[in-house]
Amino acid sequence: FENKTIWITGASSGIGKALAIKFSSLGANIVLSSRNEDELLKVANQCSTATLIIPLDLAKQDDFPEATKKVCEKFKTIDYLINNGGISQRSRATETNLEVDRLLMEINYFGTIALTKAVLPVMQNQQRGHIITISSLSGKFGFFLRSAYAAAKFAQVGFFESLRLEEERNNINVSIVFPGFVKTNISQNALSGSGKKHGVLDNNQDKGISPDKCAQDIVNGILDNKHEIYSGGKEIW
């Protein structure tokens, strides 16, 4: 990863933050994106290589072409795009406002594919690149109280499995990561059925693996060029 440019969304905390610090320790240039610029600055201070902070809201997709241009102006290439940003949900389907379903699809699906489509021409011109999308076990199996989240993650998987087949001829690799329970703030930041913050750390999340362990599993999977990368405890076996 020496001198490679790696763009990570959702980089202000959790898995994204751990990935940024890990890849920096391996010599990569790091582009940090999320909505929280203050937290991104803290992450940048923990990176030992060149960084670029690009504040990004996955719901504001019109900003993505300009953001991509800024990355290319700074680092010339985009070698890896890690689609990690997103939001979860904790509510029964019958108690979830349709606006919440739409918002999760807007951020997790449309936001992710819009940024990918902004970056793809750069990788195509380079004739190389690797796109890694952090899905979830909920992208493989439906999960209690996560109907909207699972639907968006299933959509992600369908898109990126198709993209892998299309971009193989351009020497662009596509990997999908399926984390199990990782101790991050995803459940606290998840939306309730009304769209308010859930604000509670799930028991399974609390007992999950560390973001650092998950980041190492992802790095190993990328090095092995795996199409599917799994990380977690007994739930992934």
List PLM regions with ranges.
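The beta1-alpha1 cofactor-binding region of Rossmann-like NAD(H)/NADP(H)-dependent oxidoreductases
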Residues: 56-66, 98
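Conserved glycine-rich Rossmann-like NAD(P)H-binding loop of the short-chain dehydrogenase/reductase
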Residues: 26-43
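Substrate-binding pocket helix/loop in short-chain dehydrogenase/reductase
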Residues: 92-103
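Residue(s) in the substrate-gating loop at a strand-loop-helix junction
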Residues: 136
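SDR active-site lid
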Residues: 169-233
